[in-house]
Amino acid sequence: MQIEYSKRAVKAISKINNPFKKNIKEAIEKLPSGDVRKLKGYSNAYRLRVGRYRILFDMNGKIEITDILPRGEACKG
């Protein structure tokens, strides 16, 4: 499946430390498998848990990574 990144997601990846960055990239390559949950209130929005980070993405025939946030920020909504 094709994977695209929003500008916000690219910026977030650039700020993450290398050990976490490697884990995040590996998890994204394995999408849509992994610890994925559908976000309530959205038709095609999901989140992937990778350690202390949450990868937010949409799935509409392709996967678009919309944001990558630390757990606390992702849970605030």
Where are these regions (language model features)?
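Enriched for short, Lys/Arg-rich terminal
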Residues: 2-4, 22, 50-53, 58-77
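Short N-terminal micro-motifs specific to bacterial/archaeal maturation
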Residues: 15, 30, 39, 65-66
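Short, flexible helix/strand-to-coil boundary loops that buttress conserved ligand/catalytic motifs
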Residues: 17, 43, 67-69
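Arg/Lys-rich, positively charged N-terminal/basic patches that mediate binding to nucleic acids
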Residues: 1-20
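A short, surface-exposed loop/turn module that caps and links secondary-structure elements
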Residues: 22-48, 76-77
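Alpha-helix C-terminal capping segments
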Residues: 13-16, 26-32, 57-59
